[in-house]
Amino acid sequence: CYIQNCPRGGKRSYPDTEVRQCIPCGPGNRGNCFGPNICCGEDLGCYIGTPETLRCVEENYLPSPCEAGGKPCGAGGRCAAPGVCCNDQSCTMDSSCLDEDSERQRVSPDQNMTQMNGSASDLLLRLMHMANRQQQQTKHY
C-alpha cells in the first residue's frame, strides 16, 4: 500500500515492517510508483494515467507500506523528479525539488540527452506554474 492510503491504523499498523521503496515502473523500470496512476523517475519525469503507470495499481494490493521519492515537499508529497512533487493522487511543480542538496542524485548530462539549459528549464517551470494556477482557478468546490 502507499503510505497515504494504507488500511486503518496507517503505516503504524505495521510496527515490525520497514517502509520499503514502492514498486518500479516506467520504461526500463527506471521510475517508481507514487500512486495507482503515477510513475516518476529522476531521468524520466512523471507519467500520469498512461500505460507506464498500469503496474502501479498492484501496489494497492501489497500489504506492507511503501514510500517513493526523495525529500518531503508540498502537502504530504515527496520529490519525484527535478522540480516535481507528487503524493499518491497528483503531482505539482515545486521549486524545492530542484534543490542541488536534495537526497536524490542529479542526472549527469551524458545520462540524459534531453536535459535543458537553465533558461529553457526556467521557462518550462514558469509555464507549468501558470498552467497549474489556471487549472486551480477553474476548479469548482
From Swiss-Prot:
Matching entries from PROSITE patterns are given as: NEUROHYPOPHYS_HORM (PS00264)
Q: Which residues cross the membrane?
A: none
**What GO molecular function annotation could you give as one example from this UniProt entry?**
neurohypophyseal hormone activity
PTM: Seven disulfide bonds are present in neurophysin.
One Gene Ontology term, aspect cellular component? secretory granule
InterPro entries given in the database record: Neurhyp_horm, Neurhyp_horm_dom_sf, Neurohypophysial_hormone_CS
Q: Where in the cell is it found?
A: Secreted
Using the chain's own numbering, where are the disulfide bonds? C1-C6, C22-C66, C25-C39, C33-C56, C40-C46, C73-C85, C79-C97, C86-C91
Q: What does this protein do?
A: Vasotocin is an antidiuretic hormone.
Q: What is this protein called?
A: Vasotocin-neurophysin VT
Protein's organism: Pelophylax lessonae
